[in-house]
């Protein structure tokens, strides 16, 4: 119903409610993330469970505008959790036709570059030069993350129809 509320340009209870709430025209939604950080604060799920939940809930992200496809984005791994990528891709590509490419258009990758730990990340604007160098060093790690997660994705999607969303 949420996708209908946002994107349907017609008469329906959800489109009517959107108009009543002050937004007559539908929004254009290019990307729709199904879950966020589901390995942590977004549900504390294991990857197999999330992959199956993704398969279920992506069904409800319908294209109400036949001219505009909503790209469905699955929740990807936290940093170097390659098992998450492996198991989500496995669950999403299990027993479907190749044209469905895992019922997703993208898989996100979460990586936060902070000089220390998440709990001691420091200020975004006031930091020592050594913290700047630490942050830049961690930023360079992104190339390895992209390369290794992409290799896993390619096992299931050799035609590269599923993009990595960083």
Regions found by a protein language model. Give the residues of each.
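N-terminal catalytic cores of secreted or lumenal carbohydrate-active enzymes
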Residues: 1-130, 143, 147
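The start of beta-strands in P-loop NTPase/AAA+ ATPase cores
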Residues: 105, 162-163
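Long hydrophobic segments that form regular secondary structure
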Residues: 131-162
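Hard-cation-handling environments
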Residues: 166
């Amino acid at each position: 119903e949420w996708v209908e509320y946002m994107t349907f340009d017609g008469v329906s209870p959800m489109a009517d409610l959107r108009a009543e709430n002050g937004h007559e025209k539908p929004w254009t939604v290019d990307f729709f993330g199904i879950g966020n950080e589901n390995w942590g604060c977004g549900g504390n799920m294991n990857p197999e469970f999330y992959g199956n939940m993704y398969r279920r809930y992506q069904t409800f992200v319908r294209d109400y505008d036949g001219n505009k496809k909503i790209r469905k984005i699955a929740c990807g791994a936290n940093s170097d959790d390659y098992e998450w990528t492996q198991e989500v891709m496995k669950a999403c590509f299990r027993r479907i036709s190749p044209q469905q490419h895992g019922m997703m258009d993208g898989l996100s990758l979460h990586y936060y570059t902070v000089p220390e730990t998440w709990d001691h990340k420091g200020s975004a604007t006031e930091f020592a030069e050594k913290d700047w160098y630490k942050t830049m060093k961690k930023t360079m790690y992104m190339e390895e993350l992209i390369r290794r997660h992409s290799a896993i994705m390619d096992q299931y999607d050799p035609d590269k129809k599923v993009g990595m969303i960083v």
